[in-house]
Amino acid sequence: MESSRGRPGPETDLLAVAEHQALVFGGGPGRTSSEPPAGLRVSGEEETENVGGANRHPRTSPKTSSCGVVHRPEREALENEPGPQGTLSGAGSRRGAPGAEHEPSLSSRHKNPAPPEGKPSSGRDCRRGGPGGGMDVEQQEEEDNDEEAAAGSRAGRSFSSRLQDSRSLDGLSEACGGAGSSGSAESGAGGGRRATISSPLELEGTVSRHGDLTHFVANNLQLKIRLSGAPPPPPSAPARPCPAPAPTPTPAIPPIDPEVLRDLERLSRELGGRVDRLLRGLGGAVQELTALSVGCIQTYRDAVDSLGEAVDMSIKGMYTLLARCEELERALQPVQGLARQVRDIRRTLEVLEALCK
């Protein structure tokens, strides 16, 4: 289609094609000249951008193909052709022309409705406003960067609303593709100073851009971390009517014999009685051992007491014996004098005996 329209054809063919498109886009021959058709409006913008040099960067080819525009030879033929179509294209392509007076009504009339659920947004939905309004916004973007930021934020909001309306992965991918084309168009309108980044991140948080930096703030980060760490819940079964309760199957374990329970109770009682008697005997043995220990302690105490008394009596007897010996020594002092006299007498007798011989 592009190759066939890229080359200029005969003038008659171009006029026929232009009249056919004017009838299709205009809704009939009775359409007024105050509302130009969409194809001629887009062609007027492109002719102004390419010929007048309003922007430093030309529009890309996907925009021309998505909006269904007429190629330059056809536009030249339409401009040269006298009639309402040539007047409309000239009014859409020239700034400050009388056709610009109808720009507010055109932009308000041609606002894109919100895309229905399940339908991807096309390149024409990404383009907002009429031709004159788009040219005014582009001129304001070239003059002031604040207007460019406002246009970028509006494009991001429209993209996020389109993504929220999408209910399938295919719609989401196509919406991303449409937003990418709108982002490329806005970047071309801004003179290549900044590329608008539109991604599904805007659904998960807040995306802010400062120059070349893109900041992303996630919503409910702790909840997302908790959900990512928690095991997935089991799929809930679909609600269905409650069937009649099935008969309970017979258990595989046979019924318990009551005699076994009685024997178990009797044996438990006997075991409890034996344990009680054992505990009582153990308590009596402990008491006997305690009494024996007390008797041994008392006997030891009595032995120690009697030994102490005996030692005390022996000490007292020794001291008494010493006293008696001292008394005896004092009593034997005269005997020593008698012994000396006896020795003197014996010596005298020996001397007398020697004289007698």
UniProtKB/Swiss-Prot annotation:
Q: Which GO terms describe its molecular function?
A: identical protein binding
Residue list for modification Phosphothreonine: T196
Any single GO CC term annotated in Swiss-Prot or TrEMBL for this entry: cytoplasmic side of lysosomal membrane
Q: Which domain of life is it from?
A: Eukaryota
Region annotation (Disordered) maps to: 20-196, 227-256
Describe the protein's quaternary organization and the partners it interacts with: Component of the BLOC-one-related complex (BORC) which is composed of BLOC1S1, BLOC1S2, BORCS5, BORCS6, BORCS7, BORCS8, KXD1 and SNAPIN.
Q: What does this protein do?
A: As part of the BORC complex may play a role in lysosomes movement and localization at the cell periphery. Associated with the cytosolic face of lysosomes, the BORC complex may recruit ARL8B and couple lysosomes to microtubule plus-end-directed kinesin motor.
Name of this chain's protein: BLOC-1-related complex subunit 6
Q: Which organism is it from?
A: Homo sapiens
